[in-house]
Amino acid sequence: MAAAAVARAVLFSAARRRLCGFTERLLIGGAAGRSLYFGGNRLRSTQAAAQVVLNVPETRVTCLENGLRVASEDSGLATCTVGLWIDAGSRYENEKNNGTAHFLEHMAFKGTKKRSQLDLELEIENMGAHLNAYTSREQTVYYAKAFSKDLPRAVEILADIIQNSTLGEAEIERERGVILREMQEVETNLQEVVFDYLHATAYQNTALGRTILGPTENIKSINRKDLVDYITTHYKGPRIVLAAAGGVSHDELLELAKFHFGESLSTHKGEIPALPPCKFTGSEIRVRDDKMPLAHLAVAVEAVGWAHPDTICLMVANTLIGNWDRSFGGGMNLSSKLAQLTCHGNLCHSFQSFNTSYTDTGLWGIYMVCEPATVADMLHVVQKEWMRLCTSVTESEVARAKNLLKTNMLLQLDGSTPICEDIGRQMLCYNRRIPIPELEARIDAVNAEIIREVCTKYIYDKSPAVAAVGPIEQLPDFNQICSNMRWLHD
């Protein structure tokens, strides 16, 4: 692919694209007014924050006759982001075709019936635009960033890509080699490896337990028919959202959608492909390698899907645990109690909590990198903090976590691309864009009592999934880890 021509980003895992958690990017909350204790500034700050929330542009949504949803937010910028969010990912695959969705994403920019690969790259470059794509376990996304005046061309290119890709045999063979090399690179990224293992043990023998890239033998055998069958089965109007943000007119976007997708994307004529259930299993995977300098460990319990009422509360609990790295500094002044204990005891190099949500299940847990001698101590402190969430978390801690969560969520909506991503994801997950004031109210409704109740429901005395790689001789056995999921009385 020509340099700076077509940017393609691969999301290896819904859980891993940003360890802050998939749901944290889905549920975009409002910002409470930051209290500035300088006389009248406190009131003005609160009023200003409220005014920002009220001034957020409306998200307009229209559904075409074929089921395709068109959603946009017009902020009047000179640039825009427009994309297709498709309810199709590796979870809809089986053992034989696992890896097809990701393979298809690789083929997206390799030429269509109207444009060769070179023509496509030159057109994008001449527009000053960028094309991007990624695959997760439940979604596939194609989007473009361009000048607002080029919105019609961007939509036409996206329509051409998903409806008219040539999927030539030569290009398939070339991308097969690219994906195999990509798999080798993933194997050197221990964070990626650990999260693949975590899904494999948590969702054994189910679609969520399989990797997005697929096994090597599948990559070597996937052919054009497999790719065409996947498109024919899953790329249907009711499962696609055309989302846009920036300087976009919803009426113009709607007309473009009708012209490019109104007749070509049909509804399901037969039975709609069902989302296979994925049962969580408390279990472990250990890959011991004493030659490695550091131990990499992930521990998680089963959480909930996107639309579950407890999602917000689990996100606040996730923020309470927080994240830490040796470069942070701060010492005992860190907001996270776990970060204070970790820093004071020099227990690990870094840790990061996560809350990964899917349609009907999720993983709530922590990923950490430790010295071999401190693995057991670090895990003990983590589990002790989890138990504290269930029994004795304070109102002041919860209030601080709520403010931090709302701030982080708002900060992520910086520019047309993250806003467009938020629109696309929320439309697939909730069939609407949840207003910021509503999310702000839902976060504010959480208190310490609710945190204790919900954490007891999902964490206390639950069997976790554990994935560990490296020098993990000191890691306690699984039965001991499970016993520490209960409060230990002295």
UniProtKB/Swiss-Prot annotation:
GO cellular component, one term: mitochondrial matrix
Manner of cofactor binding, per the entry note: Binds 1 zinc ion per subunit.
Coiled coil: none
Entry cofactors: Zn(2+)
Keyword Transit peptide belongs to the record: yes
Keyword NADP set for record: no
FT transit peptide: 1-46
Main location: mitochondrion
Oligomeric and partner information: Heterodimer of PMPCA (alpha) and PMPCB (beta) subunits, forming the mitochondrial processing protease (MPP) in which PMPCA is involved in substrate recognition and binding and PMPCB is the catalytic subunit.
Record's protein name: Mitochondrial-processing peptidase subunit beta
Recorded name of the encoding gene: PMPCB
